[in-house]
Amino acid sequence: QDYEKKKKVPAVLDIHGGPRTVYGEVFFHEMQVWVSRGYAVMFTNIPGSDGRGDEFADLRGKYGTIDYDALMAFTDAVLAKYKKIDPDRLCETGGSYGGFMTNWIITHTDRFCCAASQRSIANWVSMAFISDIGPMFCPDQCDAQSLYGDESTRRMWERSPLRYAENCKTPTLFIHSDEDYRCPLPEGMQMMQALCANNVETRLVIFHGENHDLSRSGKPLNRIGRLKEITGWFDRHTGI
């Protein structure tokens, strides 16, 4: 959209996956699409990201704590610096770990007017038994000793967004692929059902024949469809 100096703009907080990946100075077409429609785009490398050493990147047992705090502080800092951003029209999205973080945010604050959670983690306990890396990855990331036992289950459940879903008030779109074995479809379904039970506006979009890499190497029409779903959800809730 044409820039208008006095007009406030909505913004998208985009959270990378991993968590041990990193945003760099590269062209990212999704951000360009949103900017072209009149959004500001916010992104940063929070604790858990690569690029600042192993201690900074080690998020085991701390999911939803220092990373969440860093994202909220970052959002506050952006809003303080860029007064053109409308704090009442903030959107958030992310995939994989970014999807986990999207789920965590919507269950811990209602500062975002809408969210799009992609290929996400909702429940570490269920994911431990259905993900292709679940038996190893989930206990390790939740600082649990094994798949089994009350203490391990407690630790995984404590770090699960689904546990806190009754707090969610944010209209949320869930996107999953039915051949995603990393963050399987039931993770998004659980969150969607929890929001429905609490009368929160939600939508689940399933891409058939796609996997965890839909956004990167999916069929072209499905990649376009995915971005249209996300952007349309944002447009609807920000009034663009």
Task: Go through each PLM region and give its residues.
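Short amphipathic alpha-helix adjacent to the substrate-entry channel of hydrolases
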Residues: 25-44
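A short, aliphatic-rich alpha-helical micro-motif
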Residues: 6, 34, 165-168
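Short beta-strand-to-loop junctions in surface cap/lid or active-site-entrance loops
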Residues: 1-7, 160-162
